[in-house]
């Protein structure tokens, strides 16, 4: 991979550290405020979800219309300045309002930066190296995911929320610099022309028409969205692991094994060919991992099901994005990516809502999910 690809991977890692610092610090600080904090935390999380649903479709349009490099620089700079500003607030009431406001602004920024970040890859990485890039990026992000909670805990334990916000601002500024040194001339930027509100909705419609008529792309979105639905339900079940298995620390063990599975998956993903048949194979194998967790096996053997599941899900995710980045025309890439993100955000609360509707959480729920995944796989085949 070239130097620019390394810069983008570094930006992804830096942003991941900053986001985990921000979410951990804010959530712990709000939760420490008792009943009021619980209510505010709910508003904090819901505001992010709703904003993401509303902004994602527009983010794809902007990504296809304008310089993706400038979009990333702008969002990083805005978020960095915002975190820096609120880090100096000392009044708790003002801090609560500022955190909610900042969370909404960051959700808007991420709605624009996510599709731009995935789409710009095709401008700086050779087509045949995209799967390798995605695998390396996922490996770095998974390692950061394992290490960041410990780092976040130490920062909050020995410093304060204000220091957490300052560090988060620093990560945004570093990300800004990394993007600023990418090539200034993108491989393909649309001609500069007048851009109105009507054009936004026209572009969204054109993007949806493109997805509908490109059957292979439509199939990819269908598979990715359905997997997001099933695994949102799966993630809802995991916090109940201690009670389901009757083992203290089961949840932490399952998460640790899942992280190991993700890292291993990222290591081998670029060794596999990217094709529709491979995606369906990965999907059914991920389901096998879920199935293992529902079997009456010794606890730690059941826990290993999450290692299997995350191993194949990670490879699946890498190859889904590789397929999208290599098959979608550059003029539509941002809109296709934003559609994936929008559907993912939409399906997550639906899946979790269905799980709360169930009369009880039982081990059989894992088996039921595997049955659903297998049925979906059979229908696609």
Question: What are the roles of these predicted feature ranges?
Answer:
Residues 13, 161-163, 203-264:
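A single, central transmembrane helix in multi-pass transporters
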Residues 119, 123, 161, 165, ...:
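Helix-loop junctions on the cytosolic side of multi-pass membrane transporters
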